């Protein structure tokens, strides 16, 4: 598939193994939710696997690839999920897949690696003489396999150019929100952050939930106004502002 235009945003998620599907699914959901908040119509997602076959995970949960990874010669964003234990899976990955990742990176694709997916990025040569983050459980192994790469042991996430690294299978929301801001703006990022960070003890989160309680309806015009109120950078919203946004009279 050829390079997308500026009106489209293509995301390809590589699910390397049947474990830790959350590293892929939740990353896609963060971006998809942000695209909905931003009312971005050209958002496209694809899921691929190393052998182009379905993956079976815990409890019989399966991931079906929507395309073959070889069919993409460009994507705006490539998300590489956790590969589980690298000792069991890293050497089983087709060398051509590493070449593909390198080519995408050279063409300007953003490469997001989550948890032990960082091993894949390292083996593809994207971190040579550079820095990385890694889950503490696999940090020693990473140091043995890639001694030339400096591990930032006090960090959980790292962004270097078009490479985005998150060290845990369930702690990648901050990295994904950075991408949300780059493509959809700061206000959509803030909205997504509030949506993801709802905590019972947080007064701000509670008030945010109160707002969403009033958005459980199908009136498209009212929903448009409600989303606009949530994302606008105005401190005070007047009746005139609402009327202009809704293309209605103030009455």
Please place each PLM-identified region on the residue numbering:
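Short, well-ordered, mixed-charge alpha-helical segments that flank or form enzyme active sites
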Residues: 87-88, 120-123, 129, 141-142, ...
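Residues that mark the start of a beta-strand
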Residues: 8-11, 131, 162
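Extended, subdomain-level signal for the structured scaffold at the beginning of enzyme domains
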Residues: 1-111, 120-123, 181, 186, ...
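A conserved active-site-flanking secondary-structure segment within enzyme catalytic domains
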Residues: 128-156, 192
């Amino acid at each position: 598939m050829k390079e997308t235009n500026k009106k489209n945003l293509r995301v390809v998620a590589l699910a390397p193994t049947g474990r830790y599907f959350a590293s892929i699914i939740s990353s896609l959901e963060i971006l998809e939710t942000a695209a909905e908040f931003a009312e971005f119509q050209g958002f496209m997602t694809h899921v691929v696997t190393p052998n182009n076959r379905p993956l079976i995970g815990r409890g019989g949960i399966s991931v079906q690839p929507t395309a073959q990874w070889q069919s993409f010669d460009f994507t705006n964003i490539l998300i590489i999920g956790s590969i589980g234990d690298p000792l069991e899976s890293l050497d089983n990955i087709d060398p051509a897949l590493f070449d593909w990742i390198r080519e995408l990176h050279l063409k300007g694709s953003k490469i997001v690696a989550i948890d032990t997916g960082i091993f894949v990025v390292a083996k593809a040569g994207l971190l040579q003489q550079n820095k990385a983050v890694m889950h503490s459980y696999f940090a020693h192994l990473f140091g043995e396999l890639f001694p030339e790469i400096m591990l930032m042991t006090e960090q959980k996430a790292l962004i270097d150019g078009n490479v985005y690294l998150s060290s845990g299978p369930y702690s990648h929301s901050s990295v994904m929100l950075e991408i949300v801001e780059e493509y959809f703006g700061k206000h959509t990022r803030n909205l997504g952050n509030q949506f993801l960070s709802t905590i019972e003890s947080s007064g701000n989160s509670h008030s945010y939930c109160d707002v969403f309680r009033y958005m459980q309806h199908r009136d498209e015009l009212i929903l448009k106004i409600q989303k606009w109120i949530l994302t606008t950078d105005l401190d005070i919203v007047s009746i005139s502002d609402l009327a202009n946004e809704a293309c209605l009279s103030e009455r």
